[in-house]
Amino acid sequence: MNIKIYTIIKIYLLLIFFFQYRKLANFILINKTLSKSQIFQDLICLHLLNYKKRGTFVEIGGGNGVDLSNTHLLEKKYNWKGVICEPDKRSQKKILKNRFAKLEVKPITNKCGKQIYFYEEEDPYLSSIKKGKNKINSYKLKTICLNHLISKYKIGNIIDYISIDTEGNEFEILKKFNFKKYNVNFFTIEHNFNLVKRKKIKQIMKKNKFKQVYKFLSYMDDWYINTNIK
């Protein structure tokens, strides 16, 4: 889905959402031009975490780090630090140019050190480890799992926000994640209307004491807040 369509969706959802969640809606209205996210994931994160400054993030499937980024605003205005994971070589140059976050180029899966193919699509935002209809290039890369990624970049055991948007293997990433070792405050996870995957994600998040929030607004995502967050 292109950026123009997302803009229309954002405006439509915002108008309806305003009447149900006034405080959050006001925050979005004031800051909507600063948001780079598809559907205000960055603003939702800030609102739920009390507009925290100097937080930490992991963005898995970061695109070019600017357009449709869930962490650009967090880094630039709120001084957050973290890691952007993006295997697409076309996007990596822009991340290195425009972001302070560390860049991980290996695909994130449920296994470390496995050689797999990564497929570039015409639209870089659709590139993934799963072969799509409009593949224009492919190359082999070694994988890394989320647990090792966090350890590699010394992010710490408390992580404020993890965004997962990998065009298909979101559940596989989560099922091997050490929820007991790492205390995450907020997740945004793309399901892209795959009901089977969505159900599996919901089960694993509920099992690990996460509560789904703002179902109406999350559209192609599901958003989960740690139940320990007040």
Protein language model annotation of sequence segments:
Residues N2-K230:
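Phosphate/nucleotide-binding beta-alpha loop and adjacent structural elements of enzyme active sites
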